[in-house]
Amino acid sequence: MADTRISFDLDWTPPGASAEKPRIEFVCAPELAGRIPSPERAIRFAPEWFKRLDREMGMQDAHGLPGLTVKACLPVTDALSLGFVIPLPFDVMLQVPEDRVNIAMGWAEDVPFAPLEQHHPGQIGAPAPPFEAAMPLKFINPWRIKVPAGYSVLLTQPFNRPDLPFTCFSGFVDCDRFATTINMPFLWTGPVGQH
């Protein structure tokens, strides 16, 4: 059985590349096809606060023009739509204690793999500042990312999302030469309690 592939055309071609339109492909194991959500363009995950926001503030700016919100700012909108989001494959539960270190994780018994794992705190230098009360975790990504020769992939959390309860460690991966899945390390920055 063949791998499941999700492909998107890329809009830019590096100098000297072939005239064929470059594509990014997300490939998962066949047994996961239909059991996990597919990667999608980032704009599909625009935050609710942004969707609710009016373009105009209902008042004039210093020049007598309509006062505009960040929704009228093309650089912000472009950043929200830049790239792709790989959704968490399964529902998870976190129990975050006051110490923010001994985090308990849970998910359904029938999932084919653990969607989250812990890193050793020493990998980020914890408990030294700024990680005095931190447990590094990682999102387990079931999708391999394929790009044409000469392309690399920036892995980061969605841009302009102060509402998210986690902060990812960003990384740049040469996916044109790296033929395996890439996990995403992060810190829980949300409140303590059950989530």
Task: Go through the PLM ranges and name each one.
Residues 1-178, 189-195:
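Non-catalytic terminal segments and appended small domains
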Residues 182-186:
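Short strand-edge motifs at loop-to-beta-strand transitions and within beta-strands
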